[in-house]
Amino acid sequence: MPLSLLQELIKRPSITPQECGIYEIILNKLNSLIQKEHIDTFIIEQEKEGVKNLFYLIAPKGADKSNLHHFCFAGHIDVVPTGEGWEFEPFCGTQDEKYIYGRGTQDMKGGISAFICAVCNILESHNTSSLPIMLSILLTSDEEGEGIYGTKFMLEELKKRDLLPHSCIVAEPTSINHTGDMLKIGRRGSINGTLIIEGKQGHVAYPQKCINPIELLGSKLGALAGIELDNGDSHFAPSKLVITDIRSGMEVVNVTPQNLKIMFNVRNSPLSNEDSIRSYITSILGSLPYELTLKTNSLPFITADDSEIVKSLCAIIERTLGITPQLSTSGGTSDARFFASYGVNVVEIGVPNDRIHAINERVSISDILALHDIFVEFLQLFIKNAKIENLK
């Protein structure tokens, strides 16, 4: 059951990038169910710069793997620090009638427990001698941190070994009120920017001898701050320039500043990019003396809402839970972007996210069980469809 596995994982204080023996728990659970006469397994455990990653591949024994669809479950076992003021110990997995409490219950050990147990269900109940797909699990201990040596690094390794999946579910906590009410079928990109307006420092009593960068920018700030850079589309909200910091001067009243520095971020739709943002800012600033630096942290991506993975998940959720999931690209960046960069059809689905990174983080027992059941049904449907496809 996913509940007992979740409690076991919560008891491991895997604050980024610590792994705390979680992979051993998962490997033991999976390995105990592998029928070696029918199944080949391929395991990669890698550690780099303190980050530990696990890739576990299940494939039918002796099959031509180039002809099999490869589906992957992915997630991160690391959690953010707990802070103080918890009602329950954050690494105990306390359970009452409705909830399990602890750091990572929602983000995202709950999702991991659900898909690990779903895979175990398939291994226990399915005739693995006729498994028509490759099934894998990819886990990292560095998603909440810099993410350099986590999922991104592992996908680079998988590409070298020709083991990239064709489709993937990342079990991030995407839901709002109940498991399944929102799927993330894409994400906006993220572009950071720094703008420096150059001036000439001087005595405030002689403004004619100074060039005040604050005054230079003043009339133009309204065309930058909070401006929508495009109209968005049916899946993406408009790209918006959000100023996060403005600094100038020396905190004195008798010296005009030498320069003014603005830091900003754009969460961008596919309709905007570095070039279009630079062009827009240039058109606003005109001949002002300035220096602009832009850096793309992640690209926007979308998995088509008529793709098999999206249609299958929606159909299962509607049938089993009686709700129609909202297809969204909202929120921050996630490791799903790394899969998308390799052309993998990726969807994020998980438990609600109302308590992520918060004191007294908790997950509803019913939400965990619902997610587990969705994953089981998805795998069963995926296997059934693969068998039909193989018969054609």
Curated annotation (Swiss-Prot):
Name of the protein: Succinyl-diaminopimelate desuccinylase
Assigned EC number: 3.5.1.18
Purpose of the protein: Catalyzes the hydrolysis of N-succinyl-L,L-diaminopimelic acid (SDAP), forming succinate and LL-2,6-diaminopimelate (DAP), an intermediate involved in the bacterial biosynthesis of lysine and meso-diaminopimelic acid, an essential component of bacterial cell walls.
UniProt organism field: Helicobacter hepaticus (strain ATCC 51449 / 3B1)
Lineage of source species: Bacteria, Pseudomonadati, Campylobacterota, Epsilonproteobacteria, Campylobacterales
Entry-linked InterPro entries: Bact_exopeptidase_dim_dom, DapE_proteobac, Peptidase_M20, Peptidase_M20_dimer, Peptidase_M20A
Cofactor annotation remark: Binds 2 Zn(2+) or Co(2+) ions per subunit.
Sites where the protein binds Zn(2+) 1: 76, 107, 172
CDD domains to which the protein is assigned, alphabetical: M20_DapE_proteobac
